[in-house]
Amino acid sequence: HEKGTVCNISPNYAYTIQHGLEARKQEIRKRQENPSLNEKERVFLNSMYQCIISIQKLIEKYEQYALLNNETKIAHTLHTIKTEGAQNFRQALQLLRILHFSIWEAGNYHNTLGRFDQYMYPFYQRDLENGTLTKEEAFDLLEEFFLVCNKDSDLYPGMQQGDNGQSLVLG
């Protein structure tokens, strides 16, 4: 992405995927109660809170669109991740996708996916064990996720010649 700031951040996706956006909002509200905060800190926390509300509104719009198109599975996924943490692999991938793209939208294009294997594996493993997901279905979901992450990379000259901000750590 030619206009983004090179920042190479690796957000704590694991916490938000596991606990949800409402938990993040509660965390911010608790920090806002600290009487020793200065004005800059108050503005920062309020901005973070407003960003989460905006993400939730975006998810709500996608949920309504899914319902209009009779995509009930997608609508249910979106309804859940709008407030709660992910309950399965599909929801975890969807919330990660929205969080990742929301950070992009803020102009931070080098936000890596970090230790994807560590925070996604528990959802994958649990779904396999309880029979709600097959390895083939998981592969399809992962394939779609990574294709979407790089959907527009061919639009930018030289994009695949170096770090494109889509770093993934495995191991």
Where are these regions (language model features)?
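Catalytic cofactor-binding cores of redox enzymes
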Residues: H1-G171
